[in-house]
Regions:
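Short, acidic/polar
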Residues: 1-11, 50-57
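Catalytic domains of carbohydrate-active enzymes, especially glycoside hydrolases
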Residues: 11-19
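Conserved, mostly hydrophobic/aromatic
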Residues: 16, 38, 110, 117, ...
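Active-site core of metal-dependent hydrolases
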Residues: 19-141, 165, 204, 225
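His/Asp/Glu-enriched, well-ordered alpha-helical/loop segment
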Residues: 134-225, 247
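C-terminal cap of metal-dependent C-N hydrolases
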Residues: 198, 215-261
Length: 266
């Protein structure tokens, strides 16, 4: 409460940061003060969907540019953890009859305010990038049901991964995220592609530079052999990529070796 918010935001801008990230333990009033001042200084804000004890409704009402981690929005319904370091699973029994009005109202408000949902589907899926069953996030298909509901209500979905694949994996975690958005969350392939391009550019406040193909934007492109609109996993059939107008052939890609990784780790 004693923080000089104008000075704090100005200092963040002065570091060269591109946005303010809000997470962990903050009350709703403080969240509102941070976002209000950041916007006064024309500085974007990314926030977790729950800021303990700040509720999802508090976060949405405060109006950040991006809200991250779809399952945090489930904490709008009690019971909920007391703080960030004591997170427990969302009570899936509350969603057995459908998505409650308290949650759909949040999605409607996000749509009306133009708030992007950085859904991070990958961390909710069993496997190397996700959590074990029964952990503190979402069990079963709840995360994917929430993503689908948000998308159907017009919320912009961004393809954030909140993690990476193993060092020896031939493609980054983004591909897993896109496949989960289509295969589990039910988004059409084109919507998943938009989540990784146009919406992602908006999420990081770079839509004037990238995200769509049009004059004046950076020539950052990927060319694939197979049709990703038929199956988004076809994005793995990379022929070549273009970064700032320079082409890089996939056939020239040299995977990192275990020895190189060991050297980096040391």
């Amino acid at each position: 409460a004693d923080t000089d918010m104008a000075l704090a935001v100005a200092r963040a801008r002065g570091t060269g940061a591109t946005a303010i990230k809000i997470y962990a333990n903050l009350d709703g009033q403080t969240v509102h003060r941070i976002i209000e001042e950041a916007h006064r200084q024309d500085f974007p804000v990314w926030a977790h969907g729950m800021l303990f004890p700040g509720l999802p409704a508090d976060i949405v009402a405060a109006g950040p540019e991006v809200i991250s981690h779809v399952c945090y929005l489930g904490y709008q319904l009690p019971p909920r953890p007391a703080n960030y370091h004591e997170r427990t699973g969302v009570d899936v029994s509350l969603f057995e009859a459908g998505i409650p009005t308290e949650i759909t109202t949040l999605f409607d408000q996000m749509h009306e305010s133009g708030i992007v949902l950085d859904a991070t589907a990958r961390i909710y899926a069993p496997g190397p990038g996700g959590d074990a069953p029964g952990s503190w996030r979402c069990e079963g298909d709840l995360a994917f049901r929430l993503i689908n509901e948000a998308w159907r209500r017009g919320v912009m979905i961004s393809a954030g991964t909140d993690g990476d694949t193993a060092w020896d994996h031939p493609y980054p975690a983004l591909h897993e995220e896109l496949e989960l958005l289509t295969d589990r969350a039910g988004l059409p392939p084109m919507e998943a592609i938009r989540a990784a391009t146009a919406v992602a550019a908006r999420a990081v406040n770079q839509e004037d530079q990238m995200g769509t193909i049009e004059p004046g934007k950076l020539a950052n492109l990927v060319f694939v052999h197979d049709d990703p609109l038929a199956d988004v996993s076809n994005l793995r059939s990379v022929a070549f990529t273009v970064r700032r107008g320079v082409a890089y052939q996939r056939e020239d890609y040299v995977p990192v070796t275990e020895e190189e990784m060991a050297e980096i780790g040391s």
